[in-house]
Amino acid sequence: MSVRIEHDTFGEIEVPADKYWGAQTERSKRNFPVGKERMPIEVVYGFAQLKRAAAIANFDLGKLSEAKKDAIVYACDQILSGELDEHFPLVVWQTGSGTQSNMNVNEVVSYVANMYLKDHQSDESIHPNDDVNKSQSSNDTFPTAMHVALYQEVETKLEPALKLLRNTLKEKEDKFDSIIKIGRTHLQDATPIKLGQEISGWRYMLDRCETMLSESKKHILNLAIGGTAVGTGINAHPEFGDKVAHYISENTGYPFVSSENKFHALTAHDEVVQLHGTLKALAGDLMKIANDVRWLASGPRAGLAEISIPENEPGSSIMPGKVNPTQCEMLTMVAVQVMGNDTVVGFASSQGNFELNVYKPVIMHNTLQSIYLLADGMETFNNNCAVGIEPIEENIDNYLNQSLMLVTALNPHIGYEKAAQIAKKAHKEGLTLKESAIQTGYVTEEQFEAWIKPEDMVDPH
């Protein structure tokens, strides 16, 4: 393997000649061969947005030449294009401030920027610390890149997937509004409900999650940049943080602002905890929806079988013809993983000691994973399951007509105790509810027909 020699304050080190990173990235790569979880490329893109904005801000403030500013902006745009992904090899499991990933970006930006300057016959050169990292610290850059990445992924991936599934459920809600079925509480028969009403509960869960997500993501717009090492802003111009936030907003289209308290921004990540709490709530709702769907689709002959779902693949390696609710199982596993991630994010966020929380990479990794799992899970569940949900009306009608809980409609006419006697007699003697009611003498056939109307029970008002 062809190598080149790079150096840092620890001395010289060999780096692969075809890679753009420098000495500190190479040391991290060698010192932390831990796990397979690479630092998410979206964090790198968040850094690139930050370094780009910082270069422009430093130029505005007279701290960087125009040539250097242009070179750094060019390098950052190259990173944002996705052309340089291979040059960011570091794993999540590194220093808790994310210093090595910050330096990985600084070194790659410096390398590409220097090529740009050389191509433009400039005598200037870019240093990863003195120029790319000017007015910054890893302590304020990593949380800034984290917030930029999280906000963008919520906007571009999670929210569209949530809307997609929500809209499908709304279509099913409207389509099945005339189908009356038996409701169930405590896994036992209850009073009737429309299939559309049942699905409306699922849909409204997603409506509420969309609202909560919209609220919680607003806090992610606060950026730590400008706090530098401990929140005081040492080595940065007083206007630097605001300017960087402005330029990040200008390039992304999102209204980022510089946090009003940088001490908080470096040592606390409660804003991410709140965001992930919303992800956990969404996971809980998706767990409920997926479980309801697979229970209602259970069978085909010895289950509830009130709805059918698409048959996507063989379900068993031993039982011929078996088809399983695999999309529901996928979504419930996604939900469980997100709930586990929430524990990690909450605990890691509580570990800020004095002026810095040093669990930033694991907070970032778990939150991004939750966003991707939920987004992919909802889209896949929608396309391969939800769109194909159809009622099995014969079974729905049979369960409705056999249910003893229709007796509830007699309560206002004969009282709770007599109605209970009718239900118990029917269950014990294997009678229909109508037969039992007439045999007790509490109601006539005409009264039963007038009072027991499922269509009235689903819309009593």
From Swiss-Prot:
Keyword Lyase: yes
Enzyme Commission code(s) on record: 4.2.1.2
Compartment list: Cytoplasm
UniProt enzyme class: lyase
Gene Ontology terms: cellular component: cytoplasm
Its biological purpose: Involved in the TCA cycle. Catalyzes the stereospecific interconversion of fumarate to L-malate.
Keyword terms, alphabetized: Cytoplasm, Lyase, Tricarboxylic acid cycle
Example of a GO MF term: fumarate hydratase activity
Site (Important for catalytic activity): E329
Pathway the protein acts in: Carbohydrate metabolism; tricarboxylic acid cycle; (S)-malate from fumarate: step 1/1
Organism the protein comes from: Staphylococcus aureus (strain COL)
One Pfam family of this chain: FumaraseC_C
Active site: H186, S316
Superkingdom, natural source: Bacteria
GO biological process: fumarate metabolic process; malate metabolic process; tricarboxylic acid cycle
Catalytic activity: (S)-malate = fumarate + H2O
Assembly with partners or alone: Homotetramer.
Family listed: Belongs to the class-II fumarase/aspartase family. Fumarase subfamily.
Gene name in the database record: fumC
Extra remark: There are 2 substrate-binding sites: the catalytic A site, and the non-catalytic B site that may play a role in the transfer of substrate or product between the active site and the solvent. Alternatively, the B site may bind allosteric effectors.
Residues given in the record as substrate binding sites: 97-99, 127-130, 137-139, 185, 317, 322-324
Record bears the keyword Lyase: yes
Protein name: Fumarate hydratase class II
